[in-house]
């Protein structure tokens, strides 16, 4: 038996589908966490897709990014998530479940994360129910 055929219990085997899913969620987190840089806008503009729903959405997103400059994209991000006083959308799960920020759903999420050994990353100021954190 080859060494490659034997896996220790500490090594996880991740399917290609799960790896691609993780990459997609990481990309979404990048888009939702902060105002996108010019490099991120370029990365979005370079996306390509296939005939699947996600592929079609990727192609549409790329097409839109090709038509916009970085400043316009950042302004849209600010309008959506920051705004004057408040953005058009609040990127926090608690708000959509209870109508308030930092409510029981956030406390439950923190308990669930602690139970499986996940903690908020050092330096992250947003609460764990921020959409970018959930995508991470």
Regions found by a protein language model. Name each.
Residues 1-136:
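Surface/interface-facing alpha-helical segments and adjacent flexible terminal/loop regions used
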